[in-house]
Amino acid sequence: MKAGYFTLAAALMMMCWSQVQAGVVVGGTRLIYDGAKKESALSINNPDAVPYLIQSWVDAQEGDSAKAPFIITPPLFRLDGGQNNLLRVVRAGGNLPADKESLYWLNVKAIPSVEKKDNTLQIAIKTRIKLIYRPQGLSGNLEEAVGKLAWRRSGNRLQVSNPSPYYLTFFNLKLNGSAVAGSTMVAPQATASFSLPAGSGAGGSLSWQIINDYGGTGQTFTSTL
């Protein structure tokens, strides 16, 4: 009986895993828009057998009422099974800072094509990635920007100041080996604050990595408080 339960459980897990793997694949976790170019592109792939209706758009950051100054072509199209396409992102005006990066959100919604049946639920899959506009001629690079970060403790908070013109996204930020929860990113020429791990005393050693333009991580950086 136990072996039967294990077999059934394994089969259910494999079914769930297949569903997770199915669907439209967006070619990146972020898109860096080079201000020196007229457009940027993002690949969309459909490894499924069924077609999807793809809808895409760009949002401003939460709390920003201004319309995002980017358009996507094509904004709505059918993507058949086994096919791929490119989303072309084009800047459409907007008074963006020339001395630092600007952050927006690129949304891709994939709606599967299914036969119309009673009592069926159609589920759309939405993917949201960072769209970072990088003005032409910014000084330095991400690696140099990391070296300019200034860390300090403020009560039970960890503060980091970023004087560089780049958005820096943290990965695996730790204090004395304990993960710093909620440590996401710090905007250019700004300060971010995160909760310190429970029980962390005065001082300590920090370690972290930065997510690069391609969504990967590089070397581990260290600092002391």
What are these regions (language model features)?
Residues 94-138, 144-146, 202-225:
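Terminal connector regions
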Residues 1-8:
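Bacterial N-terminal signal peptides that target proteins for export
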Residues 22-43, 141-150:
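Beta-sheet-dominated interaction scaffolds and their linkers
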Residues 17-19:
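N-terminal signal peptide c-region/cleavage motif recognized by signal peptidases
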Residues 67-96, 177-203:
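Intrinsically disordered, low-complexity Pro/Gly/Ser/Thr-rich segments with frequent PxxP/GP/PP motifs
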Residues 152-225:
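Intrinsically disordered, low-complexity segments enriched in serine, threonine, and glycine
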Residues 40-46, 89, 104-108, 158-162:
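Buried hydrophobic-core signal for structured, non-transmembrane domains
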Residues 47-65, 163-180:
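Short acidic, flexible loop segments centered on an aromatic residue
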